[in-house]
Amino acid sequence: MENEIFTPLLEQFMTSPLVTWVKTFGPLAAGNGTNLDEYVALVDGVFLNQVMLQINPKSESQRVNKKVNNDASLRIHNLSILVKQIKFYYQETLQQLIMMPLPDILIIGKNPFSEQGTEEVKKLLLLLLGCAVQCQKKEEFIEKIQGLDFDTKAAVAAHIQEVTHNQENVFDLQWMEVTDMSQEDIEPLLKNMVSHLRRLIDERDEHSETIVELSEERDGVHFLPHASSSAQSPCGSPGMKRTESRQHLSVELADAKAKIRRLRQELEEKTEQLLDCKQELEQIEVELKRLQQENMNLLSDARSARMYRDELDALREKAVRVDKLESELSRYKERLHDIEFYKARVEELKEDNQVLLETKTMLEDQLEGTRARSDKLHELEKENLQLKAKLHDMEMERDMDRKKIEELMEENMTLEMAQKQSMDESLHLGWELEQISRTSELAEAPQKSLGHEVNELTSSKLLKLEMENQSLTKTVEELRSTADSAAGSTSKILKVEKENQRLNKKVEILENEIIQEKQSLQNCQNLSKDLMKEKAQLEKTIETLRENSERQIKILEQENEHLNQTVSSLRQRSQISAEARVKDIEKENKILHESIKETCGKLSKIEFEKRQMKKELELYKEKGERAEELENELNHLGKENELLQKKITNLKITCEKLETLEQENSELERENRKFKKTLDSFKNLTFQLESLEKENSQLDEENLELRRSVESLKCASMRMAQLQLENKELESEKEQLRKGLELMRASFKKTERLEVSYQGLDTENQRLQKALENSNKKIQQLESELQDLEMENQTLQKSLEELKISSKRLEQLEKENKSLEQETSQLEKDKKQLEKENKRLRQQAEIKDTTLEENNVKIGNLEKENKTLFKEINVYKESCVRLKELEKENKELVKRATIDIKTLVTLREDLVSEKLKTQQMNNDLEKLTHELEKIGLNKERLLHDEQSTDDSRYKLLESKLESTLKKSLEIKEEKIAALEARLEESTNYNQQLRHELKTVKKNYEALKQRQDEERMVQSSIPVSGEDDKWGRESQEATRELLKVKDRLIEVERNNATLQAEKQALKTQLKQLETQNNNLQAQILALQRQTVSLQEQNTTLQTQNAKLQVENSTLNSQSTSLMNQNAQLLIQQSSLENENESIMKEREDLKSLYDALIKDHEKLELLHERQASEYESLISKHGTLKSAHKNLEVEHKDLEDRYNQLLKQKGQLEDLEKMIKTEQEKMLLESKNHEVVASEYKKLCGENDRLNYTYSQLLKETEILQMDHKNLKSVLNNSKLEQTRLEAEFSKLKEQYQQLDITSTKLNNQCELLSQLKGNLEEENRHLLDQIQTLMLQNRTLLEQNMESKDLFHVEQRQYIDKLNELRRQKEKLEEKIMDQYKFYDPSPPRRRGNWITLKMRKLIKSKKDINRERQKSLTLTPTRSDSSEGFLQLPHQDSQDSSSVGSNSLEDGQTLGTKKSSMVALKRLPFLRNRPKDKDKMKACYRRSMSMNDLVQSMVLAGGQWTGSTENLEVPDDISTGKRRKELGAMAFSTTAINFSTVNSSAAFRSKQLVNNKDTTSFEDISPQGISDDSSTGSRVHASRPASLDSGRTSTSNSNNNASLHEVKAGAVNIQSRPQSHSSGDFSLLHDHETWSSSGSSPIQYLKRQTRSSPMLQHKISETIESRAHHKMKAGSPGSEVVTLQQFLEESNKLTSIQLKSSSQENLLDEVMKSLSVSSDFLGKDKPVSCTLARSVSGKTPGDFYDRRTTKPEFLRTGPQKTEDAYTISSAGKPTPSTQGKIKLVKETSVSRQSKDSNPYATLPRASSVISTAEGTTRRTSIHDFLSKDSRLPVSVDSSPPTAGSSSTTASNVNKVQESRNSKSRSREQQSS
């Protein structure tokens, strides 16, 4: 079955054009292979790879498997190599991207015998065709394609267009390199790019989905067992199962992960508990060992005490010594404290020194910065002045431009007036000329003269240009208004908002940091106070326990170290918290930056849409069609207008910049005022500082007073240290014990201790003095730093006050942030308290970890879903699904939806009514336009402006309506998106709150468990002194639990409120979605209505066209128009009101959208802050863990110490019993001691006061130090910001300088363009002057034609005699030519380039000699007969004028059109006016034709030069060959100039030149570059000969030999001005030929029309036919006297057939021989035959040319060269030639032909040029039938010099021939007289 289906497909495929094209590369299958074999060969890829190698031989050859044997893998390998090569070739060499889907190799490899396989092979072949057509060998492949059938050719051409031109298949990347592309070209490219992007994205999504499905299938194969078919449910699809299983697996995975985490947490907790238990066990064991040892020691001590009671006295003496040692120890301790103070002081001094150095460097940097700023200020002032001057100059230039425009308008008016006058004059002249030419019998209708036509053309051009100028001025004004309103405002607002937001963020960051640092400082101060109190208590305990002093000292040192560690840890915590907050702030900044970027992107999108709308409006506006003749000029004017528009835009930009600078200056002034206010506030601060200084001085005075009091109380200060220690350190009981002990000791020791304490007080006083001095110094430093900070704060406050404008928007956000921060701070405090007391808070943290990770995963998923939702919102598919689900859930919202639907229905009706109104307005406007057109064709110009204004208003209304609709839709879409986002965020937030609730509940449960455990422990442990403490802790825990409960209740309330908000948002979302759907339905309905209304509009337009014919009266139309205008005005007002209401609605929606965006941003910030706080809490939790462990260790140590102290307490109680007995003894001494104690109390009070003041001073110094550090950090941050701002300022300055440079460049360009415009206007004036001179020449030529009437018959007889002489000379010339051929070496046609170049060099040398001798022989020209005086006499001045007319033709290509039109008019004059029937009329026509032919002669010669110049220009590769070709071209033209200068051959020469110019049209088409380069290159080389050519022609028209010589010299003098003039004629002739060839009627038909009008012409033509028939019998021998026209044509046909048969290997000699034999056949005949011969030869060449082009591409230029050969051959029949010189000329032409044929740059000619040349041969017979009677004798201007061998013979022959000619001409003149 498959074979039966595939065989017809295979036959169709193998007969397809692509396969037939591929077969041109070679046979697909060996031998007579079937279609299947050929198809298999194609599919295997071996043959196609070979084809690709032929196309791209440079490609890297990869190994292709030639023996596939139906192996799919090998086939795929081969085809993949092919596809890679094709792709590489397109991308690298052709610079194109393949946009069509590449051929599927898998389908071709695995299933080639199918429809899909054939289609993929077709794609492959298509891509191969594209490569072949665009490769280097494309000419060969195109020739092969042209050899195919016509149908296949057409199909292949269509395929080529698909590959090359269709941008959907292949995208061209070369436009990227093009810099200057118009917007019209860029728009389709952008549209294509967008469509391609969409397609690529769709394909990418499809492929990604398929990849996911495949991977899932693979995973299912790996993991799932092969399920039986019964297990599968019949209803459920496998795709649904996959998705369900996937979801199920993901849920299970998440649960498993959560379980793993929980298990890990439990494991870690249990390990920690294990470790704690181990530590406790070890501690218990250590304590047991210690207690055992103490017990043993106590037992041994008891025994020893009993033994050593007698040694107590000795021990008491030792105790006395110990007391002394302790006193010494205390002194040393105090000194140790002093050492530590000194160390701290040294470090402080070092830090102060470093700070001073840093401040010094910073001040120096600031100095440099201020200097740079001052310099920059000067520069900015200068630049400001310069800009003002520039602005003034620009205003002056604008005024000047306006004046110039007004002057130009006035000049245009004057030119129009002058043009009208010239038109009237030309009409008058034409009328006079026609009256002269007319006879009295027939007076036909007058025809338009040349001047009239020129004037009409110029007037039409001027009118069109005026219209365009008006339209351009309107567009310029519109652009100004739009650019001023839109561009400036949007750009300024964006920049200001960005800068304000950035600076606001910085200010907020700095403020937050300052607040945080202040808080940390306060915490540190509180901690330091607590530590000081603890230190005091510890010192008291040390002094009470002097016996265990050594142990206590060690313990205190350890405690001090531990406290230092705690302080450092607290500081680290504060720093870490500060850093975390900084990071949070940075994250918030990043989020804000991203939101700003998003808003900027949205704004750019809106601007882009605006631009697109503007472009569409412009495209709709540009409906006018421009004329083909004026396209070039209009484009030029368009460019000028664009340049002017650029200038205008640049000026606008500069004006806007100036405005912005002025605004900035005003803002800076305002800021300066604000800064002055801030300076006043800082001055107040300085006053406060001064007050502080005064307080310090007062403190100094108090210290001095204290010193005096200390000196007065020296005697009583001996006992001060004991009481001080007792008052500070001990409780009441300990103080009494201490007093007893000290009373027991000697009073002498007390005095010593008092002395020691006195010394300590002295040292403390000195220290206080030093501290005060340091504080004074620091205050001075701080003052200096404050001044610096004030300066910097001024700079910072400038930026702050700039940001205050933008900070108003962010105040709401700040308030919310502060509230959130307060909440977070409360939460942090609660968490810290919980973490200090509870170990089980780890679970909470870890649960939070899991929840956070899950939330992050969910957030990532939700973000992805958001992106997909944003993409799919345009399609509204998911929104519909959501709507259905939400409708099921919420049926209550149906009522609200119905209300909304009603409102939407009303809105829809309003919209429909508005649309109907607008359509009515359109219909009315169209009616108005039709009626206005019908009213009067004469009043079109008057009403044109009104119509244009109405159209513009109508378009504006339409555009406004469309824009409002689009904007409303966009706003609603954005609202929906924002609400959806807000909903999602609220859901996320609710989930987070739920998770937090769960965690709090878990914590609550854990706390309850712990409380229960603690209660159990308390009940089990026996009651001791610690019970009170545990009770307190449990009470605190219960309080905290109550707090947590309150917090939970608050959180639940918040949750409930958030859920309510969520429900409200859901309802809002549903409403908006319903509105959106309704709006979509409305839009679709409106679109349908617009389509139907457009159709109705078209029908109405047709009806209007019919009704316009019926409308007759103007009065009824005017009344209807007035009524309609009134209606339109009413409608317009209503539309404007509606538009205002719509705009208000749009603004409300915008405000709503902004509020939603703000809410969204707030929620994002909250989420990120919570995440960051969570991270910081985790880190803090870790640190708290470590701290908790340390505290446990310390707690154990303290417990040990406590036990020791209890033991000591027991010992002390024993001692107290002993002391009580001793106290009774000491009561007497105590009475004496009380007096001392009272004094001591006074001193203690004073000492306490001093200590208090000292502590206050210390606190103040610490506060100042912290403030100083804070200020330092602020200073550093501000300096960093300052450096960054300076860098930004430098960047902006550089950008400003670059913009300045660009503006100056653009100004220079504008000036240059204005100069060019002036030059062009001058050239236009010059061309008008030239046209006037041509008109004058036309008059003179017509007058000369009238004078030449009488000489016609005389010259006819002279020509007959001349022909007889030429017949005799023919045989002599043939013999001489044959003699020359003996010495001539045959040259190969090609492949012997070196031999040709050698011959060329020889010929160039000989040519120089020929030129020298030729100049000598110019003086030997014989005189003409007296009867030919005044015939065709052109004055010398006129010839110069004609040359000057064309002098500027190549300088400005724009004037060619006018030139062409004028020359066409000149050429058609004789044919338009040849209508008289009598002989007199016939003669007049002949005179006109002769005069016009003489006028055209100069242009014909210029065309010859043009061909040479183009040929020379087309060979740019080699300089030497180019020079040789130029010289050869000059030689060829010199021969034509010499040999065709006679009056006899003037007509023939004209015909030949015309044919030659027709041949050159093909080269003009091929190489258009030659036009511009001809004046610079080709004309210089040929400067000498064309001038002599023209002068020779003028000399033949004169009677005297002297006159001819005089004019030759004049032509030679005017070499520099003339060469460029010849090129101008070429275009006029070409234009004429192209018009004739393009028209349907041939020139022969035209001639027939002319002959119908004139019977004389019919009679003449019949006579010529009879004479040809009569002369057929005599055409056998070459010596026969008369040759008929038919015989000559047959001979020319034979010559063409011979040239067609000649191959590329023929010698050039044979061709020259054949052409010379033909020329010898017609030289002896009469004049008309010679003319036709020249025509037939020149007309033959295109055919030959075409034939040679098909065989070899190297011989593409044979056509024009053979025309030159024809010139030289026809000139061989003149009476006075030297034959050897003629043969040399033949050699030169042949060599030049070879050199030109070898040009590799030649390309194919156009078909139009070939056809026109073929028609040109038949067209000119009509002119030369009139010239058959011309019998004027020829005059030889130049005789070519002889060679070295036969110079004397040739000179004698020349002289004899000239003498015989002169004598014959004189005898005939006598006879005629």
UniProtKB/Swiss-Prot annotation:
Keyword Transport among UniProt keywords: no
GO MF annotation terms: actin binding; epidermal growth factor receptor binding; G-protein alpha-subunit binding; GDP-dissociation inhibitor activity; guanyl-nucleotide exchange factor activity; insulin receptor binding; microtubule binding; phosphatidylinositol binding
Biased composition (Basic and acidic residues): 1407-1416, 1745-1755, 1822-1832, 1858-1873
Pfam families named in the record: HOOK_N
Gene3D superfamilies: Calponin-like domain
Residue ranges of the motif GBA: 1674-1704
Tissue: Expressed in the dentate gyrus, pyramidal cell layer of hippocampal regions CA1 and CA3 at postnatal 15. Expressed highly in neurons. Weakly in neuron progenitors (at protein level). Expressed in the dentate granule cell layer of the hippocampus. Expressed highly in the adult testis, moderately in the brain and at a low level in the spleen, lungs and fat.
Modified residues (Phosphotyrosine): 1767, 1801
Residue ranges of the TM segments: none
Region Disordered, annotated ranges: 816-841, 1013-1034, 1407-1459, 1560-1602, 1616-1643, 1738-1873
Topological relation to the membrane, as annotated: Peripheral membrane protein
Residues covered by the Calponin-homology (CH) domain: 12-132
Domain of life: Eukaryota
Ranges where the record places region SH2-like: 1715-1825
GO biological process: cell migration; cytoskeleton-dependent intracellular transport; lamellipodium assembly; maintenance of protein location in plasma membrane; membrane organization; nervous system development; positive regulation of cilium assembly; positive regulation of epidermal growth factor receptor signaling pathway
InterPro entries documented for this protein: CH_dom, CH_dom_sf, HOOK_N
Compositional bias annotation for Polar residues: 1417-1430, 1445-1459, 1560-1579, 1616-1626, 1768-1781, 1789-1801, 1809-1820
Knocked-out gene: effects: CCDC88A knockout mice display mesial-temporal lobe epilepsy and early demise, and structural brain developmental defects affecting the corpus callosum and cerebrum.
Free-text note regarding domains: The GBA (G-alpha binding and activating) motif mediates binding to the alpha subunits of guanine nucleotide-binding proteins (G proteins). In the presence of tyrosine-autophosphorylated growth factor receptors, the C-terminus folds into an SH2-like region which promotes the stable recruitment of CCDC88A to the growth factor receptors. The SH2-like region is phosphorylated by the growth factor receptors prior to completion of folding.
Subunit and interaction comment: Homodimer. Interacts (via GBA motif) with guanine nucleotide-binding protein G(i) alpha subunits GNAI1, GNAI2 and GNAI3. Also interacts (via GNA motif) with guanine nucleotide-binding protein G(s) alpha subunit GNAS. Interaction with G(i) alpha subunits occurs before interaction with GNAS and is regulated by phosphorylation; phosphorylation at Ser-1677 enhances binding to G(i) alpha subunits while phosphorylation at Ser-1692 abolishes G(i) alpha subunit binding, promoting binding to GNAS.
Family: Belongs to the CCDC88 family.
Protein name per UniProt: Girdin
Name of encoding gene: Ccdc88a
